[in-house]
Amino acid sequence: MPTFDVVSEVDKHELQNAIDQVNREIGTRFDFRGTEAHIEKSEEELILVAESEFQLQQMRTILDTKLAKRGVDVDCLEAKEPEIIGKRARQSIQVRQGIDKDTARKIIKIIKESKLKVQAAIQGEQVRISGKKRDDLQQVIALLREADLDLPLQYINFRD
């Protein structure tokens, strides 16, 4: 029986490379000269540090551009409100990975409403789709691409 998995993952190496590129560009740009603007990365979070909110916005634009060039979907980033304290501005950006239970339920609901002859099961932070025909699975992929989910999805382990 053909199956595939629906996941939401971020390539950590590409993310780190994009952050390094942004930090390098910030060091050479004229509008950031003499400031201590940089991006710090922890496990699942990016922290943008600058001297003003305008510089944070510029850093976010540069980050989005570099991520897009490296093939990382920008929708996986969830920005929080910037904190401005004196001459320091910080913004925390959460890197979302994995499909949470609510989104997995939405995916299963969308599949069931389509009345395709496939089964969907939640397996941790991914959803496994199985069906008798490969065409049905391809229709499910097309259906999920058109669905309005606020999370970038990847389709892996397509097996016959």
From Swiss-Prot:
Entries under InterPro entries matching the protein: DUF520 (IPR007551), UPF0234-like_C (IPR035571), UPF0234_N (IPR035570), YajQ-like_sf (IPR036183)
Family classification: Belongs to the YajQ family.
Organism: Nitrosococcus oceani (strain ATCC 19707 / BCRC 17464 / JCM 30415 / NCIMB 11848 / C-107)
Record-linked NCBIfam families: PRK05412.1
GO MF, one annotated term: nucleotide binding
Alphabetical keyword list: Nucleotide-binding
Family annotation (Gene3D superfamilies): 3.30.70.860, YajQ-like, domain 2 (3.30.70.990)
Pfam families: DUF520
Name of this chain's protein: Nucleotide-binding protein Noc_2254
Function: Nucleotide-binding protein.
Species lineage: Bacteria, Pseudomonadati, Pseudomonadota, Gammaproteobacteria, Chromatiales
Listed GO CC annotations: cytosol
